[in-house]
Amino acid sequence: MLVDGFFAAEKLRQTDRESFDFLTSRSIRFEYNSGELLLKAHGPIIELDPFDGTFSQIRFNNYDMAALDYLKYEDVARFYKALREFTAITADPNNQLWFKLSPGTLLIMGNWRVLHGRSGFTGKRMMQGCYVSMDDFFGKYRAMTFDS
């Protein structure tokens, strides 16, 4: 299942500006601990480019969200309201693309834009994940397309 996170963010901006403004202006902490690797990051759920205001990244993974003990008390309820509104948009079947991957199928996506999930599965399967740094990706792209 795939959801265009930028589309969902734009829909939130149009339907609930207060929630949109909250999710673009508050930095949230994220942590992932596999036992072998501990990753920490922070940033707004919806990140806008500081130069032109376009969407640059969606951070939306409830499993990696750290405790909210750094938020002001009065902001906790606002955070959860905004998160509920954004979640409702992403959970709307009209905003989701569902498909079944066949064996040998490769799926490449922009992880900063495309939200992804899956449903239950019975039987055997093997999934392999691979991540490419956006700095590396765009650096190589710029080098390959640079006109001297």
How would you name each of these model-derived features?
Residues 1-148:
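Active-site environment of non-heme Fe oxygenases that use a 2-His-1-carboxylate facial triad
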